[in-house]
Amino acid sequence: MNKLAILAIIAMVLFSANAFRFQSRIRSNVEAKTETRDLCEQSALQCNEQGCHNFCSPEDKPGCLGMVWNPELCP
């Protein structure tokens, strides 16, 4: 396997793990505070890609986009 393919696999694994952590955190935050969601969480839950870019911090943006691009969560 060439180096580029290995790097692509590593990037996909890291992206998936980050999206999973973000999704888990959003679920726990939604359960804990249903009325005071921040704009980044609202963007993810409403499948709003532009909202992810506008309202999420750099560390939360990949997780938000991962949820928006997931066809099971945002058809």
From Swiss-Prot:
Disulphide-bonded residues: 40-56, 47-74, 52-64
Entry's localization field: Secreted
Gene Ontology molecular function terms on file: pheromone activity
Main localization category: secreted
Keyword Metal-binding included in the entry's annotation: no
InterPro entries for this protein: Pheromone_Er1_protoz, Pheromone_protoz, Pheromone_protoz_sf
SUPFAM superfamilies: Protozoan pheromone proteins
UniProt entry tagged with the keyword Signal: yes
Keyword vocabulary terms for this entry: Disulfide bond, Pheromone, Secreted, Signal
Organism from which the protein derives: Euplotes raikovi
Biological role: Mating ciliate pheromones (or gamones) are diffusible extracellular communication signals that distinguish different intraspecific classes of cells commonly referred to as 'mating types'. They prepare the latter for conjugation by changing their cell surface properties.
Protein name: Mating pheromone Er-10
Entry-linked CDD domains: MER1_2_10
Quaternary state and interactors: Homodimer.
Propeptide: 20-37
Gene Ontology, cellular component aspect: extracellular region
UniProt-listed Pfam families: E_raikovi_mat (PF06360)
Leader sequence residues: 1-19
